[in-house]
Amino acid sequence: MSVQEITETRQYLTFKLGNEIFATDVAKVREVLDLTTITAIPRTPDFMAGVINLRGSVVPVVDLRLCFEMSKTESTRNTCIVVVEVLLDNESTVIGALADSVEEVIDLEPEQIQPAPRIGTHIRTDFIKGMGKRDTQFIMILDIDRVFSAEELAAVRGQETGKPLEAAA
């Protein structure tokens, strides 16, 4: 979904990675968890923090900071896991994303969202749905379905099903 496709007010969950504020559509967010024990999985990509047990389900957890070529997420009292539902080949997949902190849920009007800059950002522009502007602050609105490439998501889904991670080896 591009900026042009946003035609109505939407709600976004805002969260911090480092000093930058990001947002994702609340419709994609299942829940926000306090940081819990994450079990590391050998031979997975660096961005794959591990898995958690969420009410009997194995949920892969990804370090978004590493996905965006930032330093690894440090554990603080504000660190949390944002559990999101993304589409891979028209199939719903639940993934946890580490965030330094969750800020708030905000409403953004279509006119408050501008296209992402094509240069000057360390995040791939196809990951960014747009730049939200609230007061004097810019918020990077993520297209959470595109944050992970098909290959990376396939590796994460392999963890859920116990299939080998040939692409990640």
Regions found by a protein language model. Give the residues of each.
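An acidic, low-aromatic, low-complexity terminal/linker signal
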Residues: 1-169
